[in-house]
From Swiss-Prot:
<dbReference type="Pfam" id="PF03822">
    <property type="entry name" value="NAF"/>
</dbReference>
<dbReference type="InterPro" id="IPR000719">
    <property type="entry name" value="Prot_kinase_dom"/>
</dbReference>
<keyword id="KW-0808">Transferase</keyword>
<dbReference type="InterPro" id="IPR011009">
    <property type="entry name" value="Kinase-like_dom_sf"/>
</dbReference>
<dbReference type="InterPro" id="IPR008271">
    <property type="entry name" value="Ser/Thr_kinase_AS"/>
</dbReference>
<feature type="binding site">
    <location>
        <begin position="18"/>
        <end position="26"/>
    </location>
    <ligand>
        <name>ATP</name>
    </ligand>
</feature>
<feature type="region of interest" description="PPI">
    <location>
        <begin position="340"/>
        <end position="369"/>
    </location>
</feature>
<dbReference type="GO" id="GO:0004674">
    <property type="term" value="F:protein serine/threonine kinase activity"/>
</dbReference>
<dbReference type="GO" id="GO:0005524">
    <property type="term" value="F:ATP binding"/>
</dbReference>
<keyword id="KW-0418">Kinase</keyword>
<feature type="region of interest" description="Activation loop">
    <location>
        <begin position="152"/>
        <end position="181"/>
    </location>
</feature>
<keyword id="KW-0547">Nucleotide-binding</keyword>
<keyword id="KW-0723">Serine/threonine-protein kinase</keyword>
<feature type="active site" description="Proton acceptor">
    <location>
        <position position="134"/>
    </location>
</feature>
<feature type="domain" description="NAF">
    <location>
        <begin position="300"/>
        <end position="334"/>
    </location>
</feature>
<protein>
    <recommendedName>
        <fullName>CBL-interacting protein kinase 5</fullName>
        <ecNumber>2.7.11.1</ecNumber>
    </recommendedName>
</protein>
<keyword id="KW-0464">Manganese</keyword>
Amino acid sequence: MEKKASILMNRYELGRMLGQGTFAKVYHARNLASNQSVAIKVIDKEKVLRVGMIDQIKREISIMRLVRHPNIVQLHEVMASKSKIYFAMEYVRGGELFSRVARGRLKEDAARKYFQQLIGAVDFCHSRGVYHRDLKPENLLVDENGNLKVSDFGLSAFKECQKQDGLLHTTCGTPAYVAPEIINKRGYDGAKADIWSCGVILFVLLAGYLPFHDSNLMEMYRKISKGDVKFPQWFTTDVRRLLSRLLDPNPNIRITVEKLVEHPWFKKGYKPAVMLSQPNESNNLKDVHTAFSADHKDNEGKAKEPASSLKPVSLNAFDIISLSKGFDLSGLFENDKEQKADSRFMTQKPASAIVSKLEQIAETESFKVKKQDGLVKLQGSKEGRKGQLAIDAEIFEVTPSFFVVEVKKSAGDTLEYEKFCNKGLRPSLRDICWDGQSEHPSLAQSSTLTQSSKSISRHAI
């Protein structure tokens, strides 16, 4: 970036460079309106386009918007010029955790605190269907209050990236921290791979060096694959037992987060984080649009705001056929281990009746209701394991007298969501669902809709 461009988008005053990589530079900056310190990540659009990293940048934006947690670096906003993409992010003053470990191993209580915060952040990511895949001390920052912040979601994956076998298959991560199943190029569970990396990090914090290290990369991979680790003499028995379960080369018997948080060593002095409020999920689409829209002014100009309306969802014949029984029971109401991201049901009731029914459910279950941008948002009042449960219901008009309602969890714990669906949502919505026994006349007449993909308008609320 040129030195003369000290004011960015009339919003930020750029300062010194904090670091740089192949495709981006990070600067300290000051918000001109609030005087708040931020970190500005500057990404070269041309380089990103040349190497085909557009999808990765889009995914990083979506993930950072999705994972709002006290121990995760927050994304404030996304801006762009014709040649650059700018991430305005939370500025973490303390620097990398790696630099602290480089000065020597940490005391057990200090290591435990960082590890507890790391697991809290990772568990939250997993609850949102996000796997980091590159956890290491260099990607863990420490703020001025000594709290850990997870950063760099550039290699992260969504749960939806899994193939038909339910596993991820992309090899990524830093060799010394990567799980055996990734090295062996088998399909892997992103959550279990992240837990392995957390185990390596805990070892490094307590020992001051890596558990698996060799000048020969293939020999290091052999040690990782076998879980061949030697503990230093100062490791306590509890630490050794915990690390043995974290660094188990068999992912099927490796300790899970649920078991980990109940471990005596982990529980000592543990204070769960106070969750942050979750943003409007439409910001994801706006930020992605901002980053890759070609119609932007240069650095000295103002960033162009994307359109506020969202593109209508398209449902084709196969979508409608799958809904012919009224409910898509496979996602919302079956006790599957893998919860679908969203579920739909069809109804002949008008939008006003649908909204009224959702408001009635919300009142019964002590949820707050917010109607915004074609969405009915239900916000739980109780703090759950992953913060407050939040559910979005979106209404689409197929014909003037036929509607599709899409329901999905936007925040909170999946198990708590399933419980709410089974005990609250499912019984209450039965009486407004289309039973599918008699063909809907106006739908039958709509031959163009049943033969090809057509847009369905979001009904105004």
